[in-house]
A protein has these predicted regions:
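Non-catalytic C-terminal accessory region of glycerolipid acyltransferases
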Residues: 2-18, 23, 28, 86, ...
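Membrane-anchoring hydrophobic helices of lipid-metabolizing enzymes
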Residues: 2-147, 181
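Hydrophobic alpha-helical segments typical of transmembrane helices
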Residues: 42, 54, 76, 156, ...
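Short, composition-biased local secondary-structure segments
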Residues: 45-50, 152-157, 203-216
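Active-site metal-coordination segments of metallo-dependent hydrolases
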Residues: 74-75, 176-177, 236-239
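Catalytic core of membrane glycerolipid acyltransferases/transacylases, capturing the structured
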Residues: 105, 137-199, 224-229, 260
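Short, flexible loop segments at the rims of nucleotide/cofactor-binding pockets, characterized by
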Residues: 120-125, 172, 191-197, 231-233, ...
Length: 326
């Protein structure tokens, strides 16, 4: 791409409760400062001092070793048994260890993401379907990107914004605002221009779509106020927000996936757009469209099960009990 135009640089929309430090106690600020110090000198700076592949390998080995001893590992095992009831215990354990390894690689690569931009010579990020982004930009009409926690989800946002395409990227703000600002700065360094945390609500996303700006959302985690929609054969509470926004603005949903090809090497794919279901019953149309998104997510996971975020409690405990995986 020879077009060097970029959307508004460094725009960062933060939740009010995290940014209003006047309401924070001295103890909270001291705690945040200590955590940020540890972040800098135990994790970020040491990994940044290593080569990209060395950092990826180092943290992957650490998490593959300590991850199985955590409570999150037990949740992961239950989730895998829910999704793959025919797997042997060995298959479940091997996939769980692979998921820890993948998460470790993501963490190790984070300080180096500015070196991993797509659309440059010898890029570590292969992009399939990038022409869809060019079509969106030429149309001057927004889309709602939907994706999940596949492989290294950070590089999917980079593939959108570095094309470039004006897009608001949603994310979960870190509880520590000092660390959150460090992460935001790193994201800006590899091309993510407009960040919107989930705490900012849907109003900001509606404004973005209203002015023709695309939005991107992760739609694969539990949302207690959502819809019970099948996921790997079990009802999972799923956010209908992306679907509702797409329907309101008559925008297509464009699924994205990411697959790890090796240490710090990825393939990002922009898939065929999905139009929201046209059923005249709006609630039925929303359900059917959310089901399509869940089916897409499930299909991507099945291609590389160890590259998804199994640590998350995707199903409620009642579903675990019903499936006999407690």
């Amino acid at each position: 791409m020879n077009d060097d135009s970029r959307p508004e640089a460094g725009r960062f929309i933060r939740p009010v409760d995290l940014d209003n430090e006047k309401r924070s106690t001295l103890g909270a600020k001291i705690g945040w400062s200590l955590e940020a110090f540890a972040w800098d000198w135990v994790y970020w700076n040491p990994m940044a001092a290593l080569s990209l592949e060395a950092a990826s390998n180092t943290v992957s080995r650490i998490l593959k070793t300590i991850g199985p001893a955590t409570s999150q590992h037990r949740s992961m095992i239950r989730n895998l048994r829910m999704a793959f009831p025919d797997w042997s215990e060995k298959q479940v354990e091997e996939c769980a260890k692979g998921a820890w390894e993948n998460l470790g690689r993501l963490a190790g690569e984070m300080p180096h993401l500015a070196k991993m931009k797509p659309y440059v010579r010898d890029s570590r990020i292969e992009v399939v379907g990038a022409e869809r982004l060019d079509t969106i930009r030429a149309s001057k009409k927004p889309v709602v990107f939907v994706t999940g926690h596949f492989a290294n989800w950070e590089v999917m946002a980079s593939a959108i914004c570095n094309r470039p395409l004006d897009c608001q990227i949603t994310y979960r703000a870190a509880n520590n605002p000092y660390i959150d600002r460090r992460i935001a700065k790193a994201r800006h360094a590899y091309g993510i221009q407009v960040l919107t945390p989930k705490g900012a609500g849907t109003r900001e996303l509606m404004r973005a779509l209203g002015r023709g700006q695309s939005i991107a959302l992760l739609n694969d985690q539990k949302f207690n106020q959502g819809l019970a929609v099948p996921f790997f054969g079990h009802d999972a509470m799923t956010a209908p927000g992306p679907t509702r926004l797409a329907m309101k603005f008559k925008a297509p949903l464009l699924p994205i996936s990411c697959k790890r090809l090796g240490p710090a090497r990825y393939r990002v794919t922009f898939h065929e757009p999905l139009m929201p279901d046209a059923d005249p019953d709006e609630e039925k149309a929303i359900y059917n469209t959310v089901l399509l998104i869940n089916r897409f997510t499930e299909a991507v996971i099945r291609e590389a099960p160890d590259q998804w975020f199994w640590m998350h409690n995707r199903w409620p405990k009642a579903a675990w009990a019903k499936a006999g995986v407690m």
